A protein has these predicted regions:
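A short beta-loop-alpha structural element at the N-terminal edge
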Residues: 24-38
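Conserved active-site alpha-helix within GNAT-family acetyltransferase domains
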Residues: 138, 150, 155, 166, ...
Length: 226
């Protein structure tokens, strides 16, 4: 699940203070874990709030956020509201193949134990069902897209609505691209919700392009790190 980040093309952050201070980008730290969980859940329904969509609100972050900050915290960056609260983040891995192997060893067993079967239906009927979400949590091979050797890194990015349109989405992506380039990674990819047309417009403005195996119902986009 990726990125629900409509953003102004080329815009620099305006003098807006959604928190107690001026928001700024900084590296992730362990104390940000709960903030990342909160942002993930509140942007996981096609860019909207996914609280109450699944039987357990921890499911989305346990598939699309927490494994990343566990495996590669050095490739996680957050927008701090100026008082320590996380308003958005970008997370990624430099080597998807290595991440998949780590996930099988270190993440799948615990995830399976915590979530052995779907919980009580909520009546929300999301397009990405709870059964699919549980399957994603134990099947990291889903990340091995055909172009993984050309685009070995991948990312997820989410911003709370209060922060969108201020240029932080672009700056987060650029920050991660620079960090990946410094590690010798040439290109990065992402998958996204086809229904999130604002996010797609954002990626197009940044220069992302469709990969060969991209499909209308499940877009795959990539970009060079430099």
């Amino acid at each position: 699940m990726t990125a629900r980040v409509p953003d102004a093309a080329g815009a620099a952050p305006r003098a807006v203070t959604p928190g107690p201070g001026h928001p700024f980008i900084r590296p992730y730290r362990p104390s940000d874990r709960d903030g990342v969980i909160d942002v993930c859940v509140r942007t996981a329904a096609g860019g909207g709030d996914a609280r109450g969509v699944y039987s357990d609100d921890s499911l989305m972050p346990e598939v699309f956020a927490l494994p990343y900050v566990e495996y590669a915290p050095e490739l996680a960056f957050v927008v701090d509201d100026g008082g320590g609260r996380v308003l958005g983040y970008v997370i990624g891995v430099a080597d998807t193949r290595a991440f998949v192997e780590w996930w099988k060893r270190e993440w799948t067993p615990g995830f399976r134990a915590r979530h052995p079967s779907p919980g009580t239906p909520t009546g929300r009927n999301p397009a990405f069902t709870e059964e699919q979400l549980l399957a994603a949590g134990i099947d990291p091979d889903r990340m091995l897209i055909a172009e993984v050797d050309e685009y070995p890194a991948h990312l997820h990015i989410d911003l709370l609505p209060i922060l969108q349109g201020q240029g932080f989405g672009r700056r987060l992506i650029d920050t991660l691209r620079e960090a990946l380039a410094e590690r010798g990674v040439a290109a990065v990819h992402l998958g996204m919700d086809a229904a999130n047309i604002d996010a797609r417009a954002f990626y197009d403005r940044l220069g992302f392009h469709e990969l060969r195996t991209s499909r209308p119902e499940s877009p795959l986009l990539g970009i060079a790190t430099r």
